[in-house]
Amino acid sequence: MKEALEAALREILGPGEVVALRRLPGGASKEAWAVDYRTGEALHPLFLRRAGGGVIYSKTLALAEEFRLLQVAWAHGVKVPEPLHYFPDLEGREAFLMRRLEGETIGARVVRRPELARARETLPQAMAEELAKIHALSPDEVPFLQPPSLPSWRAALEEAYRDLDALGEPHPALEWGLRWLLDHPPRELPPVVVHGDFRVGNLLVDGEGLVAVLDWEFAHLGDPREDLAWPLVRAWRFGEDGKRLGGVGEVGPFLERYNALTGRDIAEEELFWWE
């Protein structure tokens, strides 16, 4: 693997050598590797994402698609690690390289660590700004993201029903909840590029604020309220339940900033359906 990485990096960053290559823990379906590449006196910290041995969820993007989406997002100013190179076959599996950035991703730390207090103050505005940029991406640049055949809300609800049916056992409270959603459909909005897992825990944060939006494998075309509501889910508050937006802030300023940037008029009450 080292030789293949060096061959690609010489074309991208110039003559040099891989001086460190270590696999990182975690990654149920994708391998994660830290790569250090030296060119003369400069050391380039990189991150390698490589296909693993299986697929956790059938609707995740292929690595080639995820890499292309990162390229588009980077080109349009979304805060993502700079994508550098895609490998169709790196020792038998596809992979891609990107810049390695420093910061914290573990949600329980983001919502509590004293040294991240300043970041928590700025995150609601920063999250709104990044979502506005993501939702402005042109679907024409990512044609592998196909529009849903049904209204986005209906497609999401039918998927929830399928997942519940697959459990093979009764869950009447969940059935009642899904029925309520079916009887109270939201207004339809035009589909946009949706990140699909936008929340604290998938945001790289340092002492000053948001560094990068990570983990794009669930991206799709859908309702923008999916991304607005997902970081409100209680599980993503990491014990700071009094702060509905990801354990770091309130929904009002976040949504107000998003609406101002996008020209949309989404009300906070609309997010309950998606949450």
Please place each PLM-identified region on the residue numbering.
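ATP-binding pocket architecture of kinase catalytic cores
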Residues: 22-155, 162-176, 185-190
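Active-site activation/catalytic loop segments of kinase-like enzymes and analogous catalytic loops
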Residues: 226-263
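Catalytic-loop of the protein kinase fold
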Residues: 193-195, 200
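All-alpha amphipathic helical-bundle segments outside canonical DNA-binding/catalytic cores
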Residues: 147-148, 265-275
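Juxta-kinase regulatory segment immediately upstream of eukaryotic protein kinase catalytic domains
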Residues: 1-14
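Conserved protein kinase catalytic-loop anchor
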Residues: 191-193, 211
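Activation of the activation-loop gatekeeper triad in protein kinase-fold domains
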Residues: 214-219
